[in-house]
Amino acid sequence: MANFPASLLILNGKSADNQPLREAITLLRDEGIQIHVRVTWEKGDAQRYVDEARRLGVETVIAGGGDGTINEVSTALIQIRDGVAPALGLLPLGTANDFATSAGIPEALDKALKLAIAGNAMEIDMARVNDKTCFINMATGGFGTRITTETPEKLKAALGGVSYLIHGLMRMDTLTPDRCEICGENFHWQGDALVIGIGNGRQAGGGQQLCPTALINDGLLQLRIFTGEELLPALFSTLTQSDDNPNIIDGASAWFDIHAPHEITFNLDGEPLSGQEFHIEVLPGALRCRLPPDCPLLR
């Protein structure tokens, strides 16, 4: 692999002491691969390191962390307007790793790192909310948002993605649906939503396939709404993905407008955004990402 250009790894600070990762990087450096490593400490670090990556002339910026880290790095990359932006590499090190998992990124660190450096760079879409905040994987509202936002860090560290489900079951008595109106291309719905998923990617909340047919290079966003008054049946519908469930509404559009009479919160790759009006649009071919040849998210 000695002929591959240099890469810069932006590593979430929580993984800075990951010994297997240190060993994998050392082995690749011994093979002649140039890998710069930078560790994030606070919000804004990813943007600064992407700027540094441009100055260093690297061809790949690797996001080492969970969906939030991938979001920060990819958002910084699409801000580059002059010249060709570095490609995005994925190194899944978070609690759930929803985007990387659905994209088929290997779980083994050494294999994921090699793919992030040497994999084919494919153009993929991103999405933008209210002309400002971006997401690469999914925007979730309702039950899913409240659970992923409120699940304690210690529970996530101990149990991983299943912690979201456990915390959700514990909070059943306090969760109510959100009344809203959602419009898109040839789509209109109004009612009470228990769960809303608007996906560029397919899964969120620790492995739940909210938008199972989503693709990241088709110029569309997939929508799935779980309706109804009773939360427990909707939760089990989320887990079983019943195709004939009358409480599941699906749609696809390059954009969606959402209006609610009260404030609701969407979770954008782990980042909460609250309001009553949301305009969500796809950004076709917004960045290049190094993905496996059999990536299930590509058409």
UniProtKB/Swiss-Prot annotation:
This protein's GO CC annotations: cytoplasm; plasma membrane
Family per record: Belongs to the diacylglycerol/lipid kinase family. YegS lipid kinase subfamily.
Keyword Metal-binding appears in the UniProt entry: yes
Active site (record annotation): 271 (proton acceptor)
Annotated DAGKc domain residues: 2-133
Statement: the UniProt record of this protein carries the keyword Cytoplasm: yes
Listed EC numbers: 2.7.1.-
Major localization class: cytoplasm
Name of the featured protein: Probable lipid kinase YegS
Cofactor binding mode and count: Binds 1 Mg(2+) ion per subunit. Ca(2+) may be able to substitute.
GO biological-process terms attached to the record: phospholipid biosynthetic process
Positions contributing to ATP binding: 40, 66-72, 95
Function of the protein: Probably phosphorylates lipids; the in vivo substrate is unknown.
InterPro entries listed in its UniProt record: ATP-NAD_kinase_N, Diacylglycerol/lipid_kinase, Diacylglycerol_kinase_cat_dom, Lip_kinase_YegS, Lipid_Phosphate_FormReg, NAD/diacylglycerol_kinase_sf, YegS/DAGK_C
Tree of life domain: Bacteria
UniProt keyword terms in alphabetical order: ATP-binding, Cytoplasm, Kinase, Lipid biosynthesis, Lipid metabolism, Magnesium, Metal-binding, Nucleotide-binding, Phospholipid biosynthesis, Phospholipid metabolism, Transferase
Locations listed in the record: Cytoplasm
Known cofactor(s): Mg(2+); Ca(2+)
Molecular function per GO: ATP binding; lipid kinase activity; magnesium ion binding
Binding site for Mg(2+): 215, 218, 220
